[in-house]
Amino acid sequence: MILFGSTGSIGVNALKLAALKNIPISALACGDNIALLNEQIARFKPKFVAIKDSKNKHLVKHDRVFIGQEGLEQILTECQDKLLLNAIVGFAGLKSTLKAKELGKNIALANKESLVVAGSFLKGAKFLPVDSEHAALKFLLEGKKNIAKLYITASGGAFYKYKIKDLNQVSLKDALKHPNWNMGAKITIDSATMANKLFEIIEAYHLYDFKEIDALIEPRSLVHAMCEFKNGASTAYFSKADMKLAISDAIFEKQDTPILEAVDFSKMPALKFHPISTKKYPIFKLKNTFLKEPNLGVIINAANEVGVYNFLENKSGFLDIAKCIFKALDHFGVPKISSIEEVFEYDFKTREYLRS
């Protein structure tokens, strides 16, 4: 397996699972966490390593260290492994997904932004979903026909129990306290704004070529997806909130190893599902428009990354993230995109506009 994003939450969990099944790791890539990368190198002995910045190269305990995006693409080309787990955060992961598709590799995709911004250019790629909701949908949809509607669930994020009027005052520390999941900073903020759920709906549309998709809040994160059939029947996928299950579905050839303790239905508290309030989560207003106009993905994602970065750096408030997105959409409208190069152009233009 080739693992990009090895020091993040998904990468660390993937390596625990790889150790469980003795899956050889041929390549590791990370951003700046060189100390953890060196521990991973010592344990998994990859043939190739990549880091973001050449200034850290001398710190890496390996004799084949590649640098930046060029280095990632070199690894994909040179390494014969058929499986890439792409756990790079954000738009930065897109070029690796495109290269892996070009090379015919199986892509265990944790980088949902690839599909959000460029789904129409990734048709035909061999994707294995790593998000828990999409792994759940894959399980529910296998061999099924006559589907009326799909649902994925949201926990509500760090501010589910907050009143709308209190969201003006929330701090970064508050926003990073996810009630159910242990994740990286960016996705934890995206969960709090509901941008993550918006992106997951578009991801599901591209993965399963189906537009009747919605999301509901299920605060305990025990139900991950539901499938409604035309005859009125519905199925649901239950599991505890732990990313290892979805990762194992993507990287293991057989799903015969105990990964989590099953949900004990006899002890399970009452489940409640709630619609997502677009007053509290204004970004979610974009769901239907986005499904109608998937080209909006590059604008929404770039603006969201700028807004989240500013919030993480204490340069703006929590509510400014949504304002950032709507400001960019007002300016650019629906982009006409006919090539992958235009995706990169619109990403650049959106960031430049919001920084000016």
UniProtKB/Swiss-Prot annotation:
Which reaction(s) are listed as its catalytic activity? 2-C-methyl-D-erythritol 4-phosphate + NADP(+) = 1-deoxy-D-xylulose 5-phosphate + NADPH + H(+)
Check the UniProt entry and state the signal peptide residues, or none. Answer: none
Q: Which domain of life is it from?
A: Bacteria
Identify which cofactors the protein needs according to its UniProt entry: Mg(2+); Mn(2+)
Pathway listed: Isoprenoid biosynthesis; isopentenyl diphosphate biosynthesis via DXP pathway; isopentenyl diphosphate from 1-deoxy-D-xylulose 5-phosphate: step 1/6
Q: Does the keyword NADP apply?
A: yes
Write out the residues that bind 1-deoxy-D-xylulose 5-phosphate: 112, 132-133, 155, 178, 191, 196-197, 200
Asked if Metal-binding is a keyword of the record, the answer is yes
Q: Where does NADPH bind?
A: 7-10, 31, 33, 111, 113, 184
Example of a GO biological process term? isopentenyl diphosphate biosynthetic process, methylerythritol 4-phosphate pathway involved in terpenoid biosynthetic process
| SUPFAM superfamilies according to UniProt | 1-deoxy-D-xylulose-5-phosphate reductoisomerase, C-terminal domain (SSF69055), Glyceraldehyde-3-phosphate dehydrogenase-like, C-terminal domain (SSF55347), NAD(P)-binding Rossmann-fold domains (SSF51735)
Q: Which GO terms describe its molecular function?
A: 1-deoxy-D-xylulose-5-phosphate reductoisomerase activity; manganese ion binding; NADPH binding
Keywords on record: Isoprene biosynthesis, Manganese, Metal-binding, NADP, Oxidoreductase
Q: What is its EC number?
A: 1.1.1.267
Q: Which family does it belong to?
A: Belongs to the DXR family.
Q: Which HAMAP family match?
A: DXP_reductoisom
Query: Can you name this protein?
Result: 1-deoxy-D-xylulose 5-phosphate reductoisomerase
Task: Identify the species of origin.
Answer: Campylobacter jejuni (strain RM1221)
